[in-house]
Amino acid sequence: MLFRSQHVKGPNLAPGGSYFEIARCLNFWQNSAIKNLSLQVEYNGGITKSYPINNAWLVGVDYFIHSKDFKNTLNLKALYKNIQEKDSDVPMQLTAVWAMNDLFGVKGLKFDGFADFWWETHAVDFREDGTCDTKKTVFITEPQLWYNVGQHFGCDNLSLGGEVELSNNFGSTGGFKCRPCLGVKWDF
């Protein structure tokens, strides 16, 4: 389904929206000098009440860095990004994904997250008269901090913590935004 109008009249009285992403790193040369370099393929897309998330196909390279015990990891990605029916000055996305387990030597304390930057010509800040602003880049990062409280009573899947979404020109909102969130997490 493609949306032609992005202006929504009336109150939004219900939660709405879906987003789907699948990404895979392909590496068939793990016993070589370039073992940390992988090919990545990815798809993302979705729908919300206030703005579309057009189908996007990404392909590129992923470079994997880790500590000797794999408790700390970092993936750096440079991806070609094709967004259906969208213009882009540079059809590319740069991504970093990290995880730090047992942070500061505290068993069960985890700091992880991602940061994405890409070029996409898109509408933001819709006004009552139907006009809006246009932006050409998007940045979003969601660093998370979790503590495994379940380890203290035999339930290793349970963590408490949260994240802070920091974004610039993300979704239908122009400019910089900070959105903190507390959470309870169950690891499957």
Regions found by a protein language model. Name each.
Residues 176-188:
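Outer-membrane beta-barrel "beta-signal"
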